[in-house]
Amino acid sequence: MPKLEMMLLVLLILPLCYIDAVGPPPPWNMEDEIIEHWQKLHCHEISDLTPWILCSPEPLCGGKGCCAQEVCDCSGPACTCPPCL
């Protein structure tokens, strides 16, 4: 096989091996982007988010989100947050 044909064959096969090794790209998830945007808006002033992660009962924020200290209400037995926007 001539060098040019061999080089073209390698160039065709190489990307296939790379895709197989890495796997397909993860599906786009708008919810993750919304959570990340919400955190950038509301969580930047909190250095340790751990105490505030359980603060919000909203599904959008639960586990991944947090409340800013000034809007988090911990006066009752559990902390609560206003609804996520």
Curated annotation (Swiss-Prot):
Keyword flag Signal: yes
GO cellular component: extracellular region; host cell postsynaptic membrane
Signal peptide residues on this chain, from the entry's feature table: 1-21
Main location group: secreted
GO molecular function annotation: acetylcholine receptor inhibitor activity; toxin activity
Disulfide-bonded cysteines: C61-C74, C66-C84, C67-C79, C72-C81
Tissue distribution: Expressed by the venom duct.
UniProt keyword annotation of Disulfide bond present: yes
Alphabetized UniProt keyword annotations: Acetylcholine receptor inhibiting toxin, Disulfide bond, Neurotoxin, Postsynaptic neurotoxin, Secreted, Signal, Toxin
Chain positions listed as propeptide in the UniProt record: 22-40
Protein's cellular compartments: Secreted
Note: Negative results: Very weakly inhibits alpha-3-beta-2/CHRNA3-CHRNB2 (19.4% when 10 uM of toxin is tested) and alpha-4-beta-2/CHRNA4-CHRNB2 (18% at 10 uM) nAChRs subtypes. Has no effect on alpha-3-beta-4/CHRNA3-CHRNB4, alpha-4-beta-4/CHRNA4-CHRNB4, alpha-2-beta-2/CHRNA2-CHRNB2, alpha-2-beta-4/CHRNA2-CHRNB4, alpha-7/CHRNA7 and alpha-6/alpha-3-beta-2-beta-3 (CHRNA6/CHRNA3-CHRNB2-CHRNB3) nAChRs subtypes.
Function text: Alpha-conotoxins act on postsynaptic membranes, they bind to the nicotinic acetylcholine receptors (nAChR) and thus inhibit them. This toxin weakly inhibits alpha-9-alpha-10/CHRNA9-CHRNA10 nAChRs (IC(50)=3 uM).
UniProt family annotation: Belongs to the conotoxin D superfamily.
Free-text comment about domains: The cysteine framework is XXVIII (C-C-C-CC-C-C-C-C-C).
Protein name: Alpha-conotoxin Lt28.1
Source organism (scientific name): Conus litteratus
